[in-house]
Amino acid sequence: QAYTTTFARTSKLREQFEVALEYPDVVGLVIGTRPDCVSQAFLDTCNEMSARTFVSVEMGLQSFDEDILVWMRRGHTAAQSIKAIEQISKACPAVNLGVHLIFGGPKETDAMAIEAAHKINALPVHNVKLHHLHVLKDTPLAEEYARGEFQPLEREVYFQRCCLFLQHLRPDIAVHRLSA
């Protein structure tokens, strides 16, 4: 996907990482990716870099619900998300692994947020970032919103859902973000 760090060729990524590490104030690398962008070359690069500096990989899962993933046009499945996390953890044991989730998809329920926490608990994840699904101007979602086909979660409902998620999340998983 365009705008995903790992969309570039691995050789280009490695070059960019090397340039970043030349700066004395850079203390590590945070790499954003998607489940469908994890290749053996990516794993090799992460493992190599993690031997030299702190490396965190942030995986944009967004949801474990297949219908919501299709609606979001993510192009990957929940099973691919789980597999990618497990691959990174196994191939790159020194890498700090985080996941991003978005709350507010159509027909999403509180029970789905609790289920997401349980699924994350079963994975080798170190941190999580939560996002509220919002409407951006000039997007297909903006058109759905304008036609009354999509309504974002109210702020209070979103934070209640976050609280439910957090109540079920393993206490050793750091929460890096509650809203974006």
Tell where the protein language model's regions lie, with residue ranges:
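Conserved strand-turn element in the central/C-terminal portion of the radical SAM core barrel
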Residues: 60, 64-68, 88-112, 131-137, ...
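Catalytic cores of alpha/beta
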Residues: 42, 106-122
